[in-house]
Amino acid sequence: MDLYDYMAPTTTTEEDDEEGYEKLKEEMGSALNNLTNGKFGLFWNSMKEKSENFLDDTKGKASSGMQQLKSQLEENIPVNSAMENLRKVEETAGSFWSGFGSTVNGFLDQALQISPKEDDVSTPTHEASSSVFLNRHERQLLELVQNENTFTQIISEPSHGITFESWEKEISIDGKTEEISLLLEEYPDLRKQMESLVPSEVSYDDFWKRFFWHKEVVQPIKAIQSGNDEEEIFSWGDERSDEEESDNEQVNDEKKQSSEEDTTENNSAAEVIDETVNDLESAVSKGLQIETQPASHDGEVDGEVKEEEENKVSSSSNIEASQSSLEVKDEANRKVDDDDEDDDDWE
């Protein structure tokens, strides 16, 4: 059976087409005639003419197509050959669209590929590198985050005399929204735990209350009981207190050292002043002794009187110098006392 015989039962004859066309034409003409009596008569008359022309044109094209199909079928072309040609056409079309799709996908992949910024290459994260240094409290926090029991296990036992029931009354999860956001951003494992457990196994409030209970109560107490140094006992707050204490101690040492140096210099100056005063007092003492000695010869009275007057002038000068030295000494001693008082006040 050829293709024409296969299609023949579903095709109509030319007589059937002619009869159907005439019938359709009559029905449309009747409908249009009824409409022309109304308000849109002119419009429908125009539509009627165009419809008749369209039907005539369609009829002609349909008849021409049927004639061509019949002529091709009458050439006795083998069905297998026709099917083979059809298969080749399908393969060619499939190959074309497959290659076209690959080309488009490759182009889109290149267009959508975004190079990472240079600033982002060296940014350390908890997921990117396992060599990131973790201090003690960060390691403990990771242990809490990765342990599912932290969030699912009901807390019934107190921790160092503190009960969970009394503690949770004083905590507000709504007040920790900002801290929770920072924790979720910094620790991806914590976000995974929340997405996995909330709300299927535990409520949102219970999830975070149990987490903060272990984070703020249990872990710090464990650190104290283990006998670790104060530096390793984390309070989850400001971690710069130890550094500030170290800086303060260093500043105190420097101040003490500077004060000791000032005291040494003041003592040295006081010793020098004492020696100078002693020399002046000795010189004054000698001058007074010369003044009180009696004359041994009458002929030498004028010379002795003159020498005595010179000695008085010298003694007077020495006394003034001694008084000035004593004033300098007193001033130095007052300065030393003031420095000592400042050191006592500072300590």
Swiss-Prot record:
Positions carrying Phosphothreonine: T123, T125
Recorded superkingdom: Eukaryota
Record protein name field: BSD domain-containing protein C22A12.14c
Pfam families: BSD
Biased composition (Basic and acidic residues): 297-312, 327-337
Matching Gene3D superfamilies: BSD domain
Matching InterPro entries: BSD_dom, BSD_dom_sf, BSD_domain-containing
Region entry Disordered, spans: 229-347
Bias kind Acidic residues: ranges: 240-251, 338-347
GO cellular component: a single term: cytosol
Comp. bias (Low complexity): 313-325
Location in the cell: Cytoplasm
SUPFAM superfamilies in alphabetical order: BSD domain-like
Keyword field: Cytoplasm, Phosphoprotein
Record-listed Phosphoserine modification sites: S235, S241, S246
Taxonomic lineage of the native organism: Eukaryota, Fungi, Dikarya, Ascomycota, Taphrinomycotina
SMART domains reported for this sequence: BSD
Ranges for domain BSD: 167-219
Natural source organism: Schizosaccharomyces pombe (strain 972 / ATCC 24843)
